Every structure is written in structure tokens, then in C-alpha cells.
């Protein structure tokens, strides 16, 4: 009985989707995926619900310290063009019609800029949503970048400065960004802002004799 109902639902759903114009079909698929996500055993995992959205809805964040060298970016483009998108772009909602990129800026740039990909993907890109406060989104971006071994020191120090000014202490910064206390202190010192480390003593390694 259950298998028969499932087969009938699957068949009806397939026929319904096939009858829709393409943009309406994509919208319907997204809505169905979100409905399934609500009852999924894996609904706590962002990748459980990958949606297709217009690339014009995505915008970069203003804090990403990641940088990809031209050869790596060229290889990334070749990989996406040949193998397809194997990783969605991680985003957060900023308003009803816009999403801010948490991770995947270069995938977005390539997907939006490559003529062959624009044609193949019909102006859409795959995204998965990660919600949270600005502090949490910054930390998520840094974790993604550091896990791949890529981040710019100066930009990273700016992130530490902002998180410190938003009320995060050294322990929380280190825990959320995967740094030890010395690394947090050094990144603060790069900015040359005394107030950021006024409550800390200098490490002996930084003492000039």
C-alpha cells in the first residue's frame, strides 16, 4: 500500500513538474525541496536542502579574507565547467530577494561570469542556506577558508578587530576561528590598535631585548 502510494505520488509529481514552464518548474522544485527538508532526518544539515536561485540574487560579503591565485581560479573554473557544481554556494538571507555569500565567492564569480556556465545553468546557481548573526557568519566564513588553508593575514586581522569590537573576547575568537591565544594576539597587534590588546601581556617571543 505504502509503496503504491509513493509510486503514484512520484509519478504525479513528475508529470506536474514536466507540465510547467522552466522558471516555474525551478520555483516549484525549490518549494518541494524546502517542504521535504522540514521532515528530513537531516534537516539540521544545510546541504540537505540545495536550492537553485538566480545569480543576480547573490551578493558578496564585506569581510571575506580569502584570495585565490589566478592559476587556482582557472583550475576551479575548468573543474566546474567539466565536472559541474559539486559544492553549493553557502548563503544567508539578507532580505526577501537577496542572499549574502558566506562561502563560495569564487564559485559564484565563475558561475556568473563564465558564458558556457551561464548558458548551461540558465542564470541560476546552487545554494544552501546558513542562518545566524553577523558574528556567526563571519566565523563560518573564516572556518571554511582556514579549513582549506587559505586566508590573508591583513584581512584576517581586520576580522579579529571587528569581532573584538563587537564584544567577543580572545577565548571566544580563538575557539570560533580555530586559533590559539598567541595567534589571536598577533592578529590584533598587526592592526596596531592598543585598545584591542590592552588587557593582555605581551608574549616573550615578541619582546625586544
UniProtKB/Swiss-Prot annotation:
Q: List the GO biological process terms.
A: cellular response to oxygen levels
Q: Which SMART domains match?
A: ParB (SM00470)
Xref: InterPro entries: ParB/Sulfiredoxin_dom, ParB/Sulfiredoxin_sf
**Name of this protein:** Uncharacterized protein YbdM
